[in-house]
Structures are given as structure tokens and as C-alpha cells.
Amino acid sequence: MGPTLAVPTPYGCIGCKLPQPEYPPALIIFMFCAMVITIVVDLIGNSMVILAVTKNKKLRNSGNIFVVSLSVADMLVAIYPYPLMLHAMSIGGWDLSQLQCQMVGFITGLSVVGSIFNIVAIAINRYCYICHSLQYERIFSVRNTCIYLVITWIMTVLAVLPNMYIGTIEYDPRTYTCIFNYLNNPVFTVTIVCIHFVLPLLIVGFCYVRIWTKVLAARDPAGQNPDNQLAEVRNFLTMFVIFLLFAVCWCPINVLTVLVAVSPKEMAGKIPNWLYLAAYFIAYFNSCLNAVIYGLLNENFRREYWTIFHAMRHPIIFFSGLISDIREMQEARTLARARAHARDQAREQDRAHACPAVEETPMNVRNVPLPGDAAAGHPDRASGHPKPHSRSSSAYRKSASTHHKSVFSHSKAASGHLKPVSGHSKPASGHPKSATVYPKPASVHFKADSVHFKGDSVHFKPDSVHFKPASSNPKPITGHHVSAGSHSKSAFSAATSHPKPTTGHIKPATSHAEPTTADYPKPATTSHPKPTAADNPELSASHCPEIPAIAHPVSDDSDLPESASSPAAGPTKPAASQLESDTIADLPDPTVVTTSTNDYHDVVVIDVEDDPDEMAV
């Protein structure tokens, strides 16, 4: 092929001023084939990089967003400027309009400057990931990374726009393309080279030196997993090789540009045309190298490349799978946003409907310990401190109260009702006539038509008092009459089936306040028959159901007949034995009751629940 003359048309190109250089035909053919290969590898390789990042979840990270951006920048020259270069090489000159020449120069500038700026962004991303790993997630979040990407391309456009003046981008017959005419303004040319090439090289070099120092300092097999360390080193090497190849490919043309811009008259005739051609083609060839480097050095990219190659055998399935992957990714993002929104709404509703803290009001009840609590192994009862109210105990009281038999009393026929209590009983014949019962450390509740006592002490004046500890299924206890005029101090024992009188005297309790009639309402009588001593002569002897106790009975034989020979003790033994088996483990404390029946012939059955919060009478 002979030398191609410049097109004699007013296109304002360098070819109109400079003659077309005479290249050997073999060199023209070689350059043409190399450019075709560059275009094919550029388009296919960078497309595969974009598909690999899109399809592989391991490659979907903020750092690879700049890798995709770099692939897009490399593809720009393969779409428009390189095909027009092939056209100029085939005809031996430029026969297109000046507008197309300006577009070729502008797109070429976007590709070159965009590539170097994206390489800088990749280096900064790797630097933050390795040297500032704690702040990496905050600095390079998805939102921030997208903002950085937009800023990168805005800077690229702003850097290329000054070259769009008419006359600065012209056709160069030595390279068969439209480039920036550095002969028109040498100062501007040096400034562009420093901003577009030298400064990015310094930034990227600093980042990779720091990264390499950090990697060498962290190469401790005992402190880090060797596999993770090797992966980081390979990732670093991949990015470093890409930077190194870019610097090597674009360094010759930038050096020639600066030399010609500084001394155009001296250097213009000394630089051969083939050197210009080789420098430009090396720079163009860099656009297809990035995809090859990813496939050679990055295992994830290499594996995804093989997947794409195998899928290319069935294009329909491949593109349908790609579309489905994109839809799944969009659905996953939508679902993630919906879940986050629902979670935020649930938290707001929980805060709005949060129940206030339950405040427990302490009971104003003076706890008086029962005698023998400390000896029986109940220090909490003997200490006098109330137990905290709990829902479990309330539930127990509620369930236990449903099984309890109502407390009843038999009044004598003459009176028909109980006489109200008015202080202590009057002492007669030197014997105490008051009955003092120390309640357990809680308020005393009388079940079923009875009075609720909350005083420090409770004084009873019935003929006899019987205590039965409550269980989960309490058994009824039938009250019995005690003959009038008898008085005794009875101590209940598990060893005997009936109480025996004792001659001991108990001094009435004086340390507690004496209740009055106003403190204790008049109890209601029950619907049971009211037997008297005349109707039931067998009840003249004092006896009660056998309740297990702790101490042995000691009684006075002169006042009461022998209970063992009493005929009334016979019918009570079966009930007592059954009650003893049910309550021997539940009776907490020995209870001593002093009774006197000078004025009343009533019998009161007291039902005591073995509950830490109440005692039912």
C-alpha cells in the first residue's frame, strides 16, 4: 500500500497540514488485525466482567462497583472510536466530518480519563479496606459508593470538556485517529498530562505502597487464617497489576506528548512516526487487558467466566437466566426494604403499646410470728418480715379457697347467735379465760361469712379452737361441742388421737393491742342445725378431731374426764386418722390455744391455710 494523501477538504485536521506518513503494507495489516482483536476482546471481556459481577454474589461488593465502571470506560473506545480508526486505516485518511472527529476525541478522552480515575477509586477502596477496615463499611456503604461513582464520572467529564474547543481536537495521520492537538497550547498540554496522568499515578502509588506494607506486617500465620491472607494478597496483586499495566501502556504516549509540548521545534523532527504509532496502539490495547487480568488472577472471576462460556452454548437459557437473576435481585432488595420497614413499624408499635411497670403496693400489715417458727425451721416467718406478694401465691389462695369448707359455728339454743367479743375474758378461779392466737406473717382472712382480722393479735372466746392446715384438696372438719364450764390448756400432738387437759396456766398476751367490738364484726350464723349439750350428751366430754402436732399433751386430770375412755372418741378416730395422714407434713408450727367457756357454749372450727400470705378462720 502506497502512502495515503490527506483528504483535500476543509476539515480542519492535522492531515491537511501534515502529509500522511508512508507505512509498509505489512505494518498497516498488522495494525488493522491488532485493532480488530482489541475491539473483540474489549467488548467480550468487559461484558463478561459486568456479567460476572452481576451474577456472582461473592463479587457483589462496593469495591467491584468501580471495576464495573472501569469496564464501561474501556468499552467506550471499542464502541465508537476504534471502528472509525479502522475505517481511516482502510482508506488511508480521514474522510468524515469535523463533528465526528470531535466526538471521537471526546469519547476517547472520556475512556482514558475515566479509566485512570476509576483505577484511582479502586486503589482508594482497597486502601480503606485493608488499612482502615473498621471504618470501611461506613465509608464505602452502597449509598456512599454510588455517590463516589457519580463524582468520579463528573470529574471525568469536567476534565475532558476543555479539550472540546474547536481546533484542539484534530485528525492525526500518524495514528489514524482524532486526538488532542498538543502543539497549539504547550502549557495547557503539560497541565492536562499532570492532572490526568501524573497526579493519579502518585495517589495510586501511595495507596498500593501502604497496602503492601500493611500486608507484609500482617503476615502472621498464628494471627490470621492463611487462606484469607492469600485471598487478600491475590486481590491486592490483581488491582496492582491492573494499575501497573495502565501506567506502562499510557506512559510512552504521555512522555512523547510532554517532550513535544515543551520543545516542539526541536523534538518534532527527532521523534520517528512509527514510535508515535506504537505508543498509541499500546495505549489502545490497554482497554482489553483488564478483563484478562481478572480471569488470570481472580478465582471468582475465572470461575464465573467458565460458567458464562458454558451458558453461551444455549443463549436463550443464558439470557433468560440472566433476566431471572436480575428479577430475583430486585425482588430480594424489595423484600429487604419491606422487612426493614415492617421491623421499624413493629418497634414503634411496641414502644407505643408498651405496658407501664407494675408497681406493687406493700400491705400495711404488722407481721407477728407464730411461736416456734424459728424452731420449726422457718426463719422467714420468725423474722417478722413480710414475704413479697407474688401472683403464684395469689393463684394458690384462689384455687385453695374454692375447695375449703365454709367455717361454721353452733350457737347455743338460748342465745341463737354469737356474743360479740369485747376485750379479754374476765378471769375466773385463777384460770385464764382468753385465747390468744398469733397470726402468720400476713393478713388473716376468715372464709365464708367470717370476719377479716388484721390486728396484731386475735382473741377467741369459743369453747374450743381447732386448727387444720390447708392442702391442695382440704377435707372437711366437723365441729363438736365442748361441755360448758370446762377449761383447759390443750397441746396437740401427733402421738395422741385426743387432747389431754393440762394444769399449766398461760398468761394472757399483753404485748399486743386488745381488739374491741368495733374491730370485729359480728359473724353470721350458718344454716347448719344448732345442737346443744342437752341434745347431744355424748359431746359433754371435750374432744376434737385428731390433728398432728409437735409437742406431747400435758393435762390436768382433775378438771376433765379421761379422753381415752370417753365414748365420744370412738366416732372421731377414722376422721382423725385420715386427716393426720393428709396434714402431718403441712402443719408448720405447734400451736397452743388457751380456751375458756364460762359464758358461751359455742364451738368454732378454725380452718388455717398453710399459705405464706393468709390464714383462714
Swiss-Prot record:
Record key words, sorted: Cell membrane, Disulfide bond, G-protein coupled receptor, Membrane, Nucleus, Receptor, Synapse, Transducer, Transmembrane, Transmembrane helix
GO cellular component terms listed in the entry, alphabetical order: nucleoplasm; plasma membrane; postsynaptic density
Topological region Extracellular: 1-30, 86-103, 165-188, 261-273
Disulfides per UniProt: C101-C178
Membrane-spanning parts: 31-51, 65-85, 104-124, 144-164, 189-209, 240-260, 274-294
SUPFAM superfamilies (alphabetical): Family A G protein-coupled receptor-like
Compartments where found: Cell membrane; Postsynaptic density
Annotated region (Disordered), positions in chain: 340-438, 464-596
Chain's role: G protein-coupled receptor that plays a role in numerous physiological processes including regulation of energy metabolism, neurite outgrowth or cell migration. Promotes self-renewal and neuronal differentiation of neural progenitor cells through activation of the NOTCH and WNT/beta-catenin signaling pathways. Modulates the KAT5-dependent glucocorticoid receptor signaling by modulating KAT5 subcellular compartmentalisation.
UniProt protein name: Melatonin-related receptor
Organism: Homo sapiens
Highest classification ranks of the organism: Eukaryota, Metazoa, Chordata, Craniata, Vertebrata
Name of encoding gene: GPR50
